[in-house]
């Protein structure tokens, strides 16, 4: 069995975690983490959108309807990129593009059209019908609903983009101080810390390294006996 990718859940919300399913966005060769519909289902399982049994049901249904699953995967990527552009723009102080909001609206409309009232422990809740198995589009619906919730409730000043040169992941800073800088301290933050450490080490080594100079043969001040036998030996600079 192929080893599954462990998705990072550092975005602070489901929709931002979906946006971050492209690794090294700012590099010349970004890495797609959703190459198949099965990977989309695995992302949904790891993110808590579906249970493990529901994920297996989705994969079986995708096997029976491969063309439908492929179309939903394509829609998921389009939605992901729209989410990324919207929230990365807000993090930079730019308003969203109408075309990207239209993508969100389209998926959100379908998601809410499928919602229905479901009994809960205390009253009712809005949920998607699962009696006949989870719909193949369920991961998209959950991400679109999450994006709407963040857009309508989160402080845009708390939206940030990881400053690492090749990363570009976005996240919602939910720390009390609002000073979170990296997508994940154990990832980009740790690498930046290591680079600063090695830079200091190299700088310190260069500053403390002794410098040597060599006298040219026959230079002034060299003893006559050494001029006769050849070049003088290098002497330590004062």
Question: Which residues does each predicted region cover?
Answer:
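Short helix-coil boundary/hinge micro-motifs
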Residues: 1-160, 168, 208-238
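Basic DNA-binding region of bZIP-type proteins
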Residues: 187-207, 211, 218, 222
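Cysteine-rich micro-motifs
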Residues: 178-189
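Extended mid-to-C-terminal alpha-helical interaction segments
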Residues: 155-177, 194-204
